[in-house]
Design a protein with these regions (language model features):
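A cross-kingdom feature that marks ATP-driven nucleic-acid transaction machinery
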Residues: 1-79
């Protein structure tokens, strides 16, 4: 498993998953949970999660509230 993008601030890490598929389902949350479980930040540093996606996102992914941020690639690119 690889972390697609890792952002760091003084007190937190943000693990970013980037997905480009026709259908993006709940399995994306399972994959990220495993990455977070394996990630070992220094003590006192929080871990946040984000998803950048291109495709059709299953409504349950957003409704679940697991990701701290969900960003469509089109918005990121200003399209």
């Amino acid at each position: 498993m690889q972390i697609d993008l890792l952002l760091q601030t003084r007190m937190s890490f943000c693990l970013v998953e980037i997905k480009r598929r026709l259908q993006i389902g709940r399995e994306v949350m399972d994959e990220m949970r495993e990455k977070v479980r394996r990630f070992s930040p220094p003590k006192g540093v929080s871990v946040r999660t984000a998803l950048i996606y291109d495709g059709e996102l299953a409504p349950s992914v957003e409704a679940d509230g697991y990701f701290d941020a969900i960003v469509p690639a089109r918005r990121l690119l200003g399209l």
